[in-house]
Amino acid sequence: MGSQDLASLIGRFKYVRVLDSNPHTKVISLLGSIDGKDAVLTAEKTHFIFDETVRRPSQSGRSTPIFFHREIDEYSFLNGITDLKELTSNDIYYWGLSVLKQHILHNPTAKVNLIWPASQFHIKGYDQQDLHVVRETPDMYRNIVVPFIQEMCTSERMKWVNNILYEGAEDDRVVYKEYSSRNKEDGFVILPDMKWDGINIDSLYLVAIVYRDDIKSLRDLNPNHRDWLIRLNKKIKTIIPQHYDYNVNPDELRVFIHYQPSYYHFHVHIVNIRHPGVGEERGSGMTILLEDVIEALGFLGPEGYMKKTLTYVIGENHDLWKKGFKEEVEKQLKHDGIATSPEKGSGFNTNLG
């Protein structure tokens, strides 16, 4: 838990500028300051409550909601319309605007996230940016990415992860925890990701953080990890449906890894397949299904992903772009014979031979 109250912090938030506004995901991110320190405030409109997916308190006292079907609720989309204005109509089509009944527990308007104090790394991650496709070779990983990972894995930067794993932070949100000091390798904790409002099962987004600390990212995986990943995948797809009373089934879960990850301690994302996005909204690289990783480790060779070239999207605000990826992409395009940024008026060169 943070040392200060969220409402108090937001009350002291001083607006500076809009970092990003996404009409598709219905998310806005603001840069500001609180008590003279940078802060990033993000608001995301919550998913609709509808009559067949209604939140009810858990009888067992679980920290996460339980969902039942075919129940009528006063805050559902249909019953919650309090005001309606028709914009226009044409034949069988009608358009309008509405106001829905809101309640902080049953039907909140938006999910709010605050990062404070926010570092330049956080700010750049949320800011609008141009994106590029990068082909990361093993040499690029060794010469550019590895030093960057070392910078990002200081005890101070990873403190929040260790707080979750060992200090009881966010225990009230934990969905599942498995840990034994005698078998640290198989231990992991599952809890809601900050992308989930914790209310609607259609937008379910969880993260499983492992206890073992010898794997920073996808790159560290090799065939020796294959059986471990198979066990992890099986446990996730068994535990999560049971926890939510099978309102989400095993084959409705997208279990995947990010590369580049947002932090370099191995973790797995667990998302309802109805969720519209899988984390690439801010140019965060690529996603690869855990089952595809498991299959690939069967034929990649003894060094696994360490010897594979990985192609993904990266934003110009990412430190890796500035630490050498920009120059490497330019070299690759030149090597491939692909022209970039022709001067205006030079015409289109059709000679591709």
Curated annotation (Swiss-Prot):
Pfam families: DcpS, DcpS_C. The keyword Heme does not apply. GO terms for biological process: cellular response to nutrient; cellular response to starvation; deadenylation-dependent decapping of nuclear-transcribed mRNA; nuclear-transcribed mRNA catabolic process; nuclear-transcribed mRNA catabolic process, nonsense-mediated decay; response to heat; response to nutrient; response to osmotic stress. Belongs to the HIT family. Present with 1870 molecules/cell in log phase SD medium. A motif (Histidine triad motif) lies at residues 265-269. The gene is DCS2. Homodimer. Forms heterodimer with DCS2; the interaction inhibits the DCS1 scavenger decapping activity during post-diauxic growth. GO terms for cellular component: cytoplasm; nucleus; P-body; perinuclear region of cytoplasm. SUPFAM superfamilies: HIT-like (SSF54197), mRNA decapping enzyme DcpS N-terminal domain (SSF102860). Disulfide bonds: none annotated. Plays a role in the cleavage of a residual cap structure following the degradation of mRNAs by the 3'->5' exosome-mediated mRNA decay pathway. Stress-induced regulatory protein that modulates the m7GpppX diphosphatase activity of DCS1. This is Inactive diphosphatase DCS2. The modification Phosphoserine is found at residue 341. Keywords: Cytoplasm, Nonsense-mediated mRNA decay, Phosphoprotein. It is found in: Cytoplasm; Cytoplasm, Perinuclear region; Cytoplasm, P-body. Residues 333-353 are annotated as: Disordered. One of its GO terms (molecular function) is protein heterodimerization activity. The keyword Cytoplasm applies. Induction: By nutrient, osmotic, oxidative and heat stress. Up-regulated during the diauxic shift.
